[in-house]
Amino acid sequence: SAYRADPAGKPRGAVVVIQEIFGVNSHIRSVADGYAADGYLAIAPALYDRAQRNFEVGYTPDDIAKGRAVKDKVALDAALKDVQAAVKTAASAGKVGIVGYCWGGYVAWMAAARVPGLACAVPYYGGGTTTDQAIAEKPKCAVMAHYGEKDEHIPVEGVKKLAAAHPSVTVHLYPAPHGFNCDQRGSYDAASAKLARSRTLEFFRKQLG
């Protein structure tokens, strides 16, 4: 299944929105709604459906543990198949970009290298994107990546390594922790979220229309 948000008028293009470890929850739905309000068809595929249908939690420590447990049951290849299906559906609206947050940032980074049909990708603090294995991937579309300098999961050294290995990738660092874009988390950083969002939108306008 997937959450779909349609723009009011003719779409400028499409954005596939990839969830965090918390499922396609109210926050991810609101992110998709936001891109629809900016003129894009937004589709958020429920990547956890393969392991547990309709999984959706909040942000307590217990929720984090539950989310991680389900994530561990979803193989990357399976997730990328679902991304591919979403890209195919979204293509009716024009060029397709992908944006992902946390685990979804990792999925978006891998999709940029492995899923055909993407015009651009925007991973937000993708956990796992700074491993040697992920850095060895070769993105086949334009990429803009957002990271927080205070991210306790992703060391800045790793981000610098990724940036050095991929000069064509635009990498932005913010004085913020992991999850800074999510206004339902304690780690929310309004100023960084706003700046990252405006940069992402500008990037989508350039790459998608």
Q: Whereabouts are the PLM-identified features?
A:
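N-terminal cap/leader regions of alpha/beta-hydrolase-fold enzymes
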Residues: S1-G209
